Amino acid sequence: MTEDNNKAAGAKPRPARQVRTGLTSTGARKASAKSNRSRAREFALQALYQHLVGRNDPTEIDHFTRDLAGFHKADAAHYDALLHGSIEGAEQLDALIRPLLDRKFEEISPIEHAVMWIGVYEFQHCLDVPWRVVLNECIELAKEFGGTDGHKYVNAVLNGLAPQLRAAEVEADRASGKARA
């Protein structure tokens, strides 16, 4: 049918096709566009949330999380490192984060707290992941799972820690113009 025939037959015109950007309407990446490491971070965030809120046993949290739909698409080794490394190093991670906070930990959302743990842990232990990728991934986690402006808080804290924890990498990016001075 031609356009004229559609009008004559009373058919409604088709809506324009949506551009596939890999983003949801909220700006978060669609599940199909996520890497296995991004998925690992999401599952680690959920597990760390259970730890922070419910004070559940890490082994039980781990077993529960591995049974969730979609876990098979995640990088299990990265998930293990983030979950167990963050829980085991919680005091050290909090000690690094605390000086950059403008409030007590008790007043911070457990989502933002867990995201900051993930970011600081990755800054320290996942040197194969560029610092800007760590920062961006954590901002995305906070946008997707956290409060309205939680991602801004996470960004400020992690951006403040990056020069301390990844000094050479941050300085190289600043010198090349890839990061702000």
Curated annotation (Swiss-Prot):
Positions of region (Disordered): 1-36
Classification via Pfam families: NusB
Keyword Nucleotidyltransferase recorded: no
BP GO terms, sorted: DNA-templated transcription termination; transcription antitermination
InterPro entries: NusB-like_sf, NusB_fam, NusB_RsmB_TIM44
Disulfide bond annotation, renumbered to this chain: none
Molecular function as annotated in GO: RNA binding
Keyword Transcription: yes
GO cellular component: cytosol
Keyword set, alphabetical order: RNA-binding, Transcription, Transcription antitermination, Transcription regulation
HAMAP family: NusB
UniProt record similarity statement: Belongs to the NusB family.
Function: Involved in transcription antitermination. Required for transcription of ribosomal RNA (rRNA) genes. Binds specifically to the boxA antiterminator sequence of the ribosomal RNA (rrn) operons.
Record-linked NCBIfam families: nusB (TIGR01951)
Protein name: Transcription antitermination protein NusB
Source organism of the structure: Variovorax paradoxus (strain S110)
